[in-house]
Structure formats: C-alpha cells, structure tokens
Amino acid sequence: DSMAYKKVMAAAFAVTLFLAGCAGSTDKGTSPAAVPLKETMNPISVRQLVAADNEHNRTIMFQLLKSVEEFVEYREKGNDRIFSVPAKGAVLKGNNGITDSYIYTSELRDLKKGAAYEYRTRTGNTVSSWMDFRTDDGGAFKTVIYPDSQSADYTGWSKLAAKAYELNKDAAFFVSMGDLVDNGQDEYQWQAWMRSMKGIMDTIPG
C-alpha cells in the first residue's frame, strides 16, 4: 500500500546517505578530502635529519616567523594518497638582525624501505611545494663529507657545498665536520649557513 511504499523509500534513502558518508571519510593520519590549496607557503631552513632507523623513519625540521598549527604531509612517489603528521613548534630566539622564529619538528614513521617519497609543509589550506626524500634500502651507500665550514661570508662555502652534492647526487646523507659556523650563539650565522645548504639538506638528511 501507499504507507508501506513510503517506508521502503525512506529506508532506501537513509542507506544511500550512510553509504555516501562512508565514501567521504578518510583514514586516520591521512589528509582530508581535496580542498583548494594555495602553494604559497615558504618555510625557512627546511632540513632532513638522520633518524635512528633510516629505512623506515625520517625527521623533518623547518622554521616559520609565527606560531601556527603546522603539519608535514608526505606521500610515496606515484601514489596520490597523502599522509599528514603534526609538527611540534618551539620558539627560537633571533639576534643580529634576525627576528625570533618558531622551529617545527615532525617525525615520519613506518615508511617503506628503499622507497622514494615527497613531502611538503602545510598550514590550513596553504602548502609549500613538494620536496623529495628517499628511505635507506639497507645496502651499500655513499655519503658527502663536508669539512669545517665556519666563515664570515658563506658565499664560497655555498659554491663548494653545491658542487660536492652536484657530483654526488646519489649520496644517502651528508656529514658536516668541525665548526659549522664561527659563533654558535649567532642565529644570523646559522641562517647564512643553512641558506648555503638549500637544495641539499632538504633533499638528503644530515
């Protein structure tokens, strides 16, 4: 009859809404459904750090001039599934013309061994460009070893560092020995050193 028909249709509509809701959900730790993103974020001094287990983990650090809710997103190359990890922030005092900033740290875990990944930073709907990293495959590896780099002007050091990496793009990580800067309490010198390592320390860990 008419009443029975209405009940059946209402039940069918409810099931349809339930299934639609399930289809729109995301796994824990993954980024939310696609929203318009602005690739205008410019984090400062992005770097990768050697982890206790380079086959499955990677630590990402970067700086911003303000305190915000920050995330690092990453995905395996060739895979559209994006994972999101919160980044912990802490105040970093500046000096010598460098303003105070916030340094953020995010640990990426349970990565695939010997796999190519890309990562980016995110605040709200603003993201940085994608940057690359690769996990250790457990086999033989190459490293770039840099000597004492402290100096008053890092122009020459920047050229040396870039050339060494250009000739060893297959390096798994880099090591900087000796004094990295002339005054370890001077944030200005640290920023100068890290600018000279851009394109290196954001691609391989050190």
Where are these regions (language model features)?
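Short, Lys/Arg-enriched N-terminal segments with co-localized hydrophobic residues
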Residues: 1-2
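Generic secretory/membrane-interface signal
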Residues: 10, 126, 173-176
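Active-site neighborhood of divalent metal-dependent phosphoester/pyrophosphate hydrolases
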Residues: 138-206
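Sec-dependent N-terminal signal peptides of Gram-positive bacterial secreted proteins and lipoproteins
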Residues: 7-25
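Acidic, histidine-bearing metal-coordination/catalytic regions of metal-dependent phosphoesterases
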Residues: 20-145
